[in-house]
């Protein structure tokens, strides 16, 4: 299973994070499938490759809670229309 999660970069006391698509069994610093974004909590900057993120989500990738909050704040899910079916 693939997850969208944060990968820590930077130096001590000055962390920046890459948002990556990675296999769920890999370590936090393990080899990722693709880098799909960047997040700097100190400067509060975010860069997202939205087409790549939506592609991974459509293929079944699950974002972690923190990545979900970042994507929600950036309004990525407004572009991704969930197709819901009702069963009576």
Swiss-Prot record:
Organism: Silene latifolia
Main location: plastid
InterPro entries for this protein: Ribosomal_bS16, Ribosomal_bS16_CS, Ribosomal_bS16_dom_sf
UniProt keyword Ribosomal protein present: yes
Localization of this protein: Plastid, Chloroplast
GO cellular component: chloroplast; mitochondrion; small ribosomal subunit
Keyword set, alphabetical order: Chloroplast, Plastid, Ribonucleoprotein, Ribosomal protein
GO biological process, one term: mitochondrial translation
Gene field: rps16
Keyword Plastid: yes
One Pfam entry name: Ribosomal_S16
Origin: domain of life: Eukaryota
Similarity section: Belongs to the bacterial ribosomal protein bS16 family.
Lineage, opening ranks: Eukaryota, Viridiplantae, Streptophyta, Embryophyta, Tracheophyta
GO molecular function, one term: structural constituent of ribosome
Protein name: Small ribosomal subunit protein bS16c
